[in-house]
Amino acid sequence: MNDRPFTHVIELLHKAGLRPTRQRMALARLLFDEGNRHLTAEDLHREAKNANIPVSLATVYNTLHQFTSAGLLREMVVEPGRAYFDTNLTRHHHFFFEDTGEIEDIPHNLVSISQLPKIPKGTAISKVDVVVRLRSAEQVKN
């Protein structure tokens, strides 16, 4: 058993060029120790409070944006005013369940795009993100 439970988090932060502060390490463990997931700053703040980690919502926001800038997370905006953070950095797309706000990964090879519009001169496509929005079948009928 590892005598230093934060060793992997410290290495992760160092590789990303971030100083491993106590709060960053605690939030990184919450984020990355459970595998791939999607969550908002409010979700992570709630998890931190439940784990007795003393951190403000502003610190959670700042840390998530630092992790995103360092390449540890991917930020997604799927509804106005609400950003989700994705720990899965591989190529993939998403289902967004409008009823619950949950997000589920779709492997990139299961989505096919046959044609894109002509892009403006002097630009290049950096990536294409697909978000498939889902509702319960009853809501779609109405």
Question: What feature does the model see in each segment?
Answer:
Residues 60-70:
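Basic amphipathic alpha-helical segments that dock to polyanions
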Residues 26-29, 43, 59-62:
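Amphipathic alpha-helical interaction segments
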